[in-house]
Amino acid sequence: MKMRYCVLVSVLAILVIRGSAENCGRQAGGALCPGGQCCSKWGWCGTTPDHCGTDCQSQCGGTPSPGPSGSDITNLIPRSTFDRMLLHRNDGACPGKNFYTYDGFIAAARSFGAFATTGDTDTRKREIAAFLAQTSHETTGGWASAPDGPYSWGYCFLREQGNPGAYCTPSAQWPCAPGRKYFGRGPIQITHNYNYGPAGKALGVDLLNNPDLVATDPAISFKTALWFWMTPQSPKPSCHDVITGRWTPSAADRSAGRLPGFGVITNIINGGLECGHGSDSRVQDRIGFYKRYCQIFGIGTGDNLDCGNQRSFGSGRLVDTM
């Protein structure tokens, strides 16, 4: 009788915990857990090994514990360093002039508890460098002979240039709003309704009806890029897990040449177009930004920067092409 009572109490406790937990991950349209908690494979938020261990979906570092003294992101990347890295983002020739603010970046970063809080100080700085490098490539206004070099011109562009289409794919879950277009905007140049929808749901903002918030609100703009950065989509790991060393490649990954490093992040973002066919100028541009930012931080880049010999992960529902 006592044994049956204990089992019943345990079951009820689990039900109470599950009933009170917030849905997250693929079960909730890519939603992230509050406070940097882990999202378990079942779509529940928490910080236990069951949440943060095998098959954890996002923010798998859990609620960050207090880091080394001075590890707050404003100490890792003060305003002066941010301005040095994105040296020409406010140049008069840049369409995104005065939009990508330091305060917007910091506000967005602090809303993702595991970003730049995982690992030692060098690992945290390396994550910032990798994030800013990949997004600098997506928004670059640089050219080979640009003043201060091509890798000083990240975050120049805000909206996709030319005459972009609607990027509307019929979807019952993420229906396109009348008259709205889902072309590239912001640091990651997020595209398509099936990306704006889950990003907005995760952030608590209606981006299907208001996609231009990504180009008018700096914090939301950075948050969409960080949402992409922190969110895995099988078989792709999250960029966060790769750069912080939390991702262990499977046998299939290894046979495809996908080893931990900056190159896998390029594969996650745009591998179908840029990886697996030897040298690619776009890949080299990403690496160029990354090396410069790591140099400014005074840290190493790690190994496996290129993806020329990696097979693509294949098409996913997150941002497939930029």
UniProtKB/Swiss-Prot annotation:
GO terms for biological process: cell wall macromolecule catabolic process; chitin catabolic process; defense response; polysaccharide catabolic process. Residues 1-21 form the signal peptide. This is Endochitinase. Defense against chitin-containing fungal pathogens. It comes from Actinidia chinensis var. chinensis. Disulfide bonds join C24-C39, C33-C45, C38-C52, C56-C60. It is an enzyme of class 3 (hydrolase). The lineage of its organism: Eukaryota, Viridiplantae, Streptophyta, Embryophyta, Tracheophyta. One of its GO terms (molecular function) is endochitinase activity. Residues 22-62 form the Chitin-binding type-1 domain. It catalyses: Random endo-hydrolysis of N-acetyl-beta-D-glucosaminide (1->4)-beta-linkages in chitin and chitodextrins. Its EC number is 3.2.1.14. Keywords: Allergen, Carbohydrate metabolism, Chitin degradation, Chitin-binding, Disulfide bond, Glycosidase, Hydrolase, Plant defense, Polysaccharide degradation, Signal. Belongs to the glycosyl hydrolase 19 family. Chitinase class I subfamily.
